[in-house]
Design a protein with these regions (language model features):
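Membrane-interface extramembranous regions
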Residues: 1-133
Length: 133
């Protein structure tokens, strides 16, 4: 799998960002617990279950992206960015449909990571097509 320096840098930024958001959820930091405080009442999923599942999905995303860099695995790269796309779309839905008031900084971060994911997926496809020509 051919990658550019920009693609590698974006992957590193993504790994750091998604890891930064996964760890508080998994270790139960107070701010993270508060962030998931109304899941049960709004959509019927216990707050802690929603928090842990989100944290695990984010951690898996980070691991896949690390593997895509260290093992140069195209499959890990694509799966990681597809998972990131779904996670960020879920995050945006959460901000607007579940939270009483969206936290705009989280919205901006989710949009930025979503743009990176789409860019990386499109970049992977275009590099693959160039390799086959």
């Amino acid at each position: 799998m051919k990658t550019t320096t920009i693609a590698k840098l974006l992957t590193i930024i993504t790994i750091v960002a998604i890891g930064y958001f996964a760890l508080p959820k998994l270790i139960g930091l107070e701010q993270s617990v508060k962030g998931f405080s109304n899941f049960n009442e709004v959509i019927g999923i216990p707050n802690n279950i929603a928090r842990y599942v989100t944290g695990v999905v984010e951690l898996i995303t980070a691991i896949l992206l690390i593997l895509s860099l260290t093992r140069k695995s195209e499959v890990a790269h694509i799966l990681g960015y597809l998972l990131l796309t779904g996670t960020m779309l879920g995050g945006l839905l959460t901000e607007y449909l579940i939270r009483p008031e969206p936290k705009m900084m989280l919205v901006y971060i989710a949009i930025a990571l979503l743009i990176i994911a789409v860019y990386q997926l499109l970049n992977t496809y275009s590099l693959k097509t160039v390799d086959h020509e």
